[in-house]
Amino acid sequence: MSRVGKKPVPVPSGVTATVTGQTVKVKGSKGELQFVVPSQVVVEFKDGAVSVQPKDQSKQARSLWGTSRAQVANLVEGVSKGFEKKLEITGVGYRAAMAGKALKLSLGYSHDIEYEIPAGITIVTPKPTEIVVSGIDRQRVGQVAAEIREYRGPEPYKGKGVKYAGEFIFRKEGKKK
C-alpha cells in the first residue's frame, strides 16, 4: 500500500484542476500545466481534491501509484507557488551574468559558456557567484539547474565549481610529502 499515493492532492483556492481521461490539467496564477497519468493508474477529481488509485494490485500499478500522485502534487504546487533552485559558484574568477536571454558563465575555461535559457524558465543572478533558477515545472527547473552545474561541478580538493545551495561537498586531503 502506497503511503504517498493514498493521500488525495488538495487543490487550493485560485487553482483549477480538470481530469479528462488520463490527462490532468491544472491552471493557477503562475500558469498552466498538464500531466498524462500512466494507464495502470486511475485519477479522479472530487471534493476539491485529486485522488489517484491503482487499476489493479500488480507491482507495476502499485509502483506508479505514488509516483503519479507526487507528479500531480508537483503540478498543483508549481502553478500556485512555483519552484526555484539556487546554485552557488566558488572559485577565483568564476562568475555568472545575464547576457540578454542567455546566461554567461566564466568557469575557468579558455572561453565563456553561453547557456540558452529554455522557455518557461527564469534565471536571475543576484550576485556574480549566485544563480537562481525558477519556473512552474519542477522537473524542468531541476534539469536546467543540473545542466548548469554540469559545466563545472564542484571538485573535492578546493571545492571550486558550481554547486547547489546547501549541498555538502565531500572534501579530500591533498597528497603528503
UniProtKB/Swiss-Prot annotation:
User: Which GO biological-process labels does this protein carry?
Assistant: cytoplasmic translation
**Cellular component annotations (GO), alphabetically ordered:** cytosolic large ribosomal subunit
Taxonomy, superkingdom = Bacteria
Any signal peptide, and if so, which residues? none
Q: Which GO terms describe its molecular function?
A: rRNA binding; structural constituent of ribosome
Keyword list, A-Z: Ribonucleoprotein, Ribosomal protein, RNA-binding, rRNA-binding
What Pfam families does the database record attribute to this sequence? Ribosomal_L6 (PF00347)
Similarity-based family: Belongs to the universal ribosomal protein uL6 family.
Cited function = This protein binds to the 23S rRNA, and is important in its secondary structure. It is located near the subunit interface in the base of the L7/L12 stalk, and near the tRNA binding site of the peptidyltransferase center.
Which proteins does it associate with, and in what oligomeric form?
Part of the 50S ribosomal subunit.
Stated name of the protein: Large ribosomal subunit protein uL6
Organism of origin is Methylorubrum extorquens (strain PA1) (Methylobacterium extorquens)
